[in-house]
Amino acid sequence: MQWEVVIGLEIHTQLTTRSKIFSGSSTQFGSEPNTQASLIDLGMPGVLPVLNQEAVRMAVMFGLAIDAEIGQHNVFARKNYFYPDLPKGYQISQMELPIVGKGHLDIALEDGTVKRVGITRAHLEEDAGKSLHEEFSGATGIDLNRAGTPLLEIVSEPDMRSAKEAVAYVKAIHALVRYLGICDGNMAEGSLRCDCNVSIRPKGQAEFGTRCEIKNVNSFRFIEKAINSEIQRQIDLIEDGGKVIQQTRLYDPNKDETRPMRSKEEANDYRYFPDPDLLPVVIEDSFLNDVRATLPELPPQKRERFQSAFGLSAYDANVLATSREQADYFEKVASIGGDAKLAANWVMVELGSLLNKQNLDIEDSPVSAEQLGGMLQRIKDNTISGKIAKVVFEAMANGEGSADEIIEKCGLKQVTDTGAISAVLDEMLAANAEQVEQYRAADEAKRGKMFGFFVGQAMKASKGKANPQQVNELLKSKLEG
């Protein structure tokens, strides 16, 4: 039987506010346990939550970016459940009236096509604390620093049909929230976490199968592996005559399998009701307009502009627009260097390789956009060749100065004097007289391969400084003369 996979995702994004959603406690990551939890975060009697307006602004900004309905009258609700790291015994969230309603996001797939994924809603809520199992023997520690940190939970429609589509969607959300500046996207620190809802059904069937939720997956690679593992588990189970039970599961990367955590709850299990300590949130039109005016150029528009204004391919535009920092870096290099396609190649290939080797983000690049743009100017005006440029780039990465300083100090200027190049070629051809005779006696097909040998010898003789184009032209003339 052929199976169709149905995937919907819930993405929890930690908002980059300096204080928590209902208290003035700091949201800074990495502090000593339980040093950033106020009486409000601890749920002490007699204290009242106060909504952080900046969290509201960030949620509205996200809603506008996905062309969603904004809930101008939205309500906070209590989600009631017991867990050791939830001090109040309930979580303040939103249920019936969320701040962001239906919207959509267009995602770029590996084959170059674009798919629209529906977004059901996005709502504000507070994060729970954190249980610490490894640090204690025979016990569990509780760190409440994270309790009360503002989250925007983004709930997709079940529109994805493969693990790769799901990863593409998460990457698009990751890029968007970073572009907007509302989440740092640091998955290792838990700033962006994903719950994956997975089910299968016979191909052509309209009714959904029974879904299982994989909780708290925190890397793109694990999202793909967890979903594929769960798909195979469900297929094997049904084909062996079993039945999928609705449940919450965890992904074990060491065994590459999902394992049951608990039976899957429904909304009524949480006994949602409006939080009596918080008034309904009313968003005025003027507030909406103010937020709309601060929206930056978003990834889809940036990709489109990179193709139309710079003549880049869809692939190159997509790669360069992955993050706001990378897009800004590329544009600065292109404006200084004067050649967008050359800039794109250097940013994606040479710079990308350098950053990967050193495990750096582009904002921490040892080669600034100004330095790289300056070096591309020297390629454009024939001061250096593309081959010598790699030597200059490596020197810049090692902190040896600007391109001009390195070229001058190391004597790397390209030789463009026709007479000087001609003399080098004459000497090289004389030293390879036998190969010259073979070339002249060969047919056209063999000459092509042999010509490359002479070019290599010429560049070697000039220590890579001879202008390659002039070498080709003069060499052809001498060999066929």
Curated annotation (Swiss-Prot):
Keywords: ATP-binding, Ligase, Nucleotide-binding, Protein biosynthesis. SMART domains: GatB_Yqey. It catalyses: L-glutamyl-tRNA(Gln) + L-glutamine + ATP + H2O = L-glutaminyl-tRNA(Gln) + L-glutamate + ADP + phosphate + H(+); L-aspartyl-tRNA(Asn) + L-glutamine + ATP + H2O = L-asparaginyl-tRNA(Asn) + L-glutamate + ADP + phosphate + 2 H(+). Gene3D superfamilies: 1.10.10.410, GatB domain, N-terminal subdomain. Signal peptide: none annotated. Its EC number is 6.3.5.-. InterPro entries: Asn/Gln-tRNA_amidoTrfase_suB/E, Asn/Gln-tRNA_Trfase_suB/E_cat, Asn/Gln_amidotransferase, Asn/Gln_tRNA_amidoTrase-B-like, GatB, GatB_C_1, GatB_Yqey_C_2, Gln-tRNA_amidoTrfase_suB_CS. Pfam families: GatB_N (PF02934), GatB_Yqey (PF02637). PROSITE patterns: GATB. The keyword Metal-binding does not apply. GO terms for biological process: glutaminyl-tRNAGln biosynthesis via transamidation; translation. GO terms for molecular function: asparaginyl-tRNA synthase (glutamine-hydrolyzing) activity; ATP binding; glutaminyl-tRNA synthase (glutamine-hydrolyzing) activity. Heterotrimer of A, B and C subunits. Allows the formation of correctly charged Asn-tRNA(Asn) or Gln-tRNA(Gln) through the transamidation of misacylated Asp-tRNA(Asn) or Glu-tRNA(Gln) in organisms which lack either or both of asparaginyl-tRNA or glutaminyl-tRNA synthetases. The reaction takes place in the presence of glutamine and ATP through an activated phospho-Asp-tRNA(Asn) or phospho-Glu-tRNA(Gln). Belongs to the GatB/GatE family. GatB subfamily. This is Aspartyl/glutamyl-tRNA(Asn/Gln) amidotransferase subunit B. The lineage of its organism: Bacteria, Pseudomonadati, Pseudomonadota, Gammaproteobacteria, Pseudomonadales. The gene is gatB.
